[in-house]
Design a protein with these regions (language model features):
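Amphipathic alpha-helical scaffolding segments comprising HEAT/armadillo-like alpha-solenoid repeats
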Residues: 1-12, 32-51, 72-86, 104-121, ...
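Structural detector for internal amphipathic alpha-helices that build alpha-solenoid repeat scaffolds
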Residues: 20-33, 53-75, 80-83, 92-106, ...
Length: 222
């Protein structure tokens, strides 16, 4: 184990003993990914599994599951995360959280692969899944709002975003609709402006979403 990895693990252990550990501390492992983290992290996770359940009303954070997802990425890369996304059922919340922290190019590959799970149509049962998909992709899109991501990513992601928006409209879910619309700041270009103008939001909080994203696209491609 390198000195840097050992130092980081000891810091995590100290925070855990003080009951000050946060998910953000675990995610910092992804800034300098190394397979050397896997064994000590899994040892910590095993200890958490044996901890007593928190009292009623106390927020339970599934640290062991977060470590599980981080270790899958360290061991198998994004392909491992894609395979594990629905095992167990709610694991996707954590997988998307990990995807938000890894290099953008890797995350995009995973998001395109994951989109295949609803390529033939989004079902009512997938609403929460798609909501988290759009939210996480939206978070990543903020990093790229001033960059030209290229024709390939535009052609790959815009149909997915339109599919999600169409589903959100049918469910009257403006949260999903807004997050998917904001993603156009990264993947959209001038050819999408008329489409964005056609989108209408009823909630005041979201009403200017389309206009804001159009301005960002126009500025980017001026």
């Amino acid at each position: 184990m390198t000195e840097a990895v050992e130092k980081h693990i000891k810091k995590l252990q100290r925070l855990d003993k003080k009951d000050e550990l946060e998910v953000e501390h675990l995610l910092k492992v992804l800034k300098t990914p190394s397979k050397e983290y896997i064994v000590p992290l899994r040892e910590m996770a095993e200890q958490w599994k044996n901890d007593p359940q928190p009292q009623e009303g106390v927020l339970f954070v599934p640290y062991a599951e977060w470590v599980g997802a981080i270790c899958i990425y360290l061991e198998e890369g994004t392909q491992g995360l894609v395979k594990a996304i629905d095992k167990p059922k709610e694991f996707f919340h954590i997988v998307f959280g990990v995807l938000e922290e890894i290099p953008v190019s890797e995350a995009f590959t995973a998001f395109l692969e994951i989109a295949k799970t609803f390529s033939t149509g989004i079902t009512d049962e997938q609403e929460d899944f798609v909501k988290k998909y759009a939210y996480s992709l939206c978070c990543i899109s903020h990093q790229l709002k001033g960059e030209n991501v290229g024709k390939d990513l535009h052609e790959a992601f815009v149909p997915i975003l339109k599919q999600i928006i169409s589903f959100a409209q049918s469910k009257k879910n403006e949260t999903i609709m807004c997050n998917a619309t904001v993603c156009f700041q990264a993947f959209g270009d001038k050819s999408d402006i008329e489409y964005l103008k056609s989108l209408t939001f009823t909630e005041d909080y979201y009403k200017n979403t389309g206009k804001t994203i159009i301005k960002r696209i126009e500025k980017k491609y001026a």
